[in-house]
């Protein structure tokens, strides 16, 4: 079989794949996956912004904690993007798209205290965690639902860690 036949787009704009998930489910799942790609890219960048710029009590503990968060976020991000492609879609993760489509509020760049960063991070982690939980119930592709469930567990744990470090909720 020629390569041209394998990548030829159908009328639906999905890229040909032998994956037998129905086209409607693929389309809806790819949409959800790409929404999560956008959110996880933004959350990853926000996490690094805080990691670089915080100062104050508990700096080193929170600084190192955020490194672990970012690694896990990037692992889930990669899984979501690759799943979109596995289903015949295109992973949409450019800086322009993230800026245009993220539901997260712009992260303040003029804050410095560990506590201020923890609050801002907790707010944004909460938004993404809640979206992922909703996506679990909406998606009809069981493999993607499993991916969302794994991400949800990690995000809930990270949110708990952030909130546990906040002095004043």
From Swiss-Prot:
Species, as recorded: Yersinia enterocolitica serotype O:8 / biotype 1B (strain NCTC 13174 / 8081)
Record's subunit section: Homododecamer. The 12 subunits form a hollow sphere into which the mineral iron core of up to 500 Fe(3+) can be deposited.
Signal peptide coordinates: none
UniProt xrefs under CDD domains: DPS
Record keywords: Cytoplasm, DNA condensation, DNA-binding, Iron, Iron storage, Metal-binding, Oxidoreductase
GO biological process, one term: chromosome condensation
HAMAP family: Dps
GO MF term list: DNA binding; ferric iron binding; oxidoreductase activity, acting on metal ions
Domain of life: Bacteria
Location in or out of the cell: Cytoplasm
EC number annotated for this UniProt entry: 1.16.-.-
Principal subcellular localisation of the protein: cytoplasm
Gene Ontology cellular-component terms listed: cytoplasm
Binding-site residues for Fe cation, renumbered to this chain: 51, 78, 82
Cited function: During stationary phase, binds the chromosome non-specifically, forming a highly ordered and stable dps-DNA co-crystal within which chromosomal DNA is condensed and protected from diverse damages. It protects DNA from oxidative damage by sequestering intracellular Fe(2+) ion and storing it in the form of Fe(3+) oxyhydroxide mineral, which can be released after reduction. One hydrogen peroxide oxidizes two Fe(2+) ions, which prevents hydroxyl radical production by the Fenton reaction.
Enzyme class: oxidoreductase
Family membership noted in the UniProt record: Belongs to the Dps family.
PANTHER family in UniProt: DNA PROTECTION DURING STARVATION PROTEIN, GENERAL STRESS PROTEIN 20U
Designated name of the protein: DNA protection during starvation protein
Reactions catalysed, as given in the entry: 2 Fe(2+) + H2O2 + 2 H(+) = 2 Fe(3+) + 2 H2O
PROSITE patterns assigned: DPS_1
